[in-house]
Curated annotation (Swiss-Prot):
Organism per entry: Histophilus somni (strain 129Pt)
GO molecular function: nucleotide binding
Keyword presence, Isomerase: no
Identification of the protein by name: Nucleotide-binding protein HS_0688
Family: Belongs to the YajQ family.
Listed Gene3D superfamilies: 3.30.70.860, YajQ-like, domain 2 (3.30.70.990)
Amino acid sequence: MPSFDIVSEITLYEIRNAVENANRVLSTRYDFRGVEATIELNEKAETIKVTTESDFQLEQLIEILISACVKRDIQHNSLDIPADSEHSGKLYSKEIKLKQGIETDMAKKIIKLIKDAKLKVQTQIQGEQVRVSGKSRDDLQATIQLVKNAELGQPFQFNNFRD
């Protein structure tokens, strides 16, 4: 019986490259001359810390980071950007988390979406991924298109396709 897995993964070396590119752009921006501003990647905690002197500049820095991520084919909704910023002394900062894996609530939404479409496939949650199996490849391809076109707020990849 054919099957595949729905996963949500970000390659850390692409994130590292995006952060380095964003820092390079930051060093050439005129509006950030003489301003203490940093974009730092913590690979172990899978977070990006963005720090600068004002709230407005913080939003500008996040836009620079998002554009660098998009250039590296990392979708911006794979970054979990908090709404409010932390303020300590003269610096504002935000701790941006990277969305790795599919949480249980999101997996349940995916399964509900597939069941509501009445496709002839079986779904099951396996840790941080969703396994989809069915009798025909056409049903599996329809499932892939359904999940791709759904606005679930997280990018998904499809791997481990077996016949």
